[in-house]
């Protein structure tokens, strides 16, 4: 449709212009950047403009059946089409090097960096020299009467909860909360994600310590002399990703 083509042209030009400004200040933004997700609603026409691994989903209620419309596709480094572009531009994609855990990241063949977990972003000037892109992907949906809400969230949400989980969580809360309390729903969603991150950190630490203990036993001929004491434990970086979420409620219809 013509409106979508115009939106793609406008936002591609806008994001490219912003990236050029970042490039002019490359000392400040060489290895620093951001993802972006925007929603433009004109009458009942919605355009989702995505760059990076934030995500937009719509919760739809069809005669009591809860349906999820995922309105954006994450720009992860290991997405096949994204990986291909990166490799053509002198980069490569590999799992995070520390302990062999973590997401796939973008690296330069001639440098240890940039180690980006996304394949598109604004800023990250060094990453853009090896195929990271500032061109957004745009999706379109004609909003319907039974579209109840749209959620946009950073990767700190989606790395620990799937799209159906998040939409189901919000529907469940809507059925319990009165209208003026809806601000609490997004606050509780963010807290739920934070709780899950904390559990992941505990699990990650357990795996790393078990691996290190196993290696020590091999070195010492099958005997772990320190007994795995707390004092001898290495400092393991605890990670809770940025957790940002916004919920836009339409005329919620739960029937």
Q: Which residue stretches match the model-derived regions?
A:
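PP2C/PPM-type serine/threonine phosphatase catalytic core
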Residues: 1-255
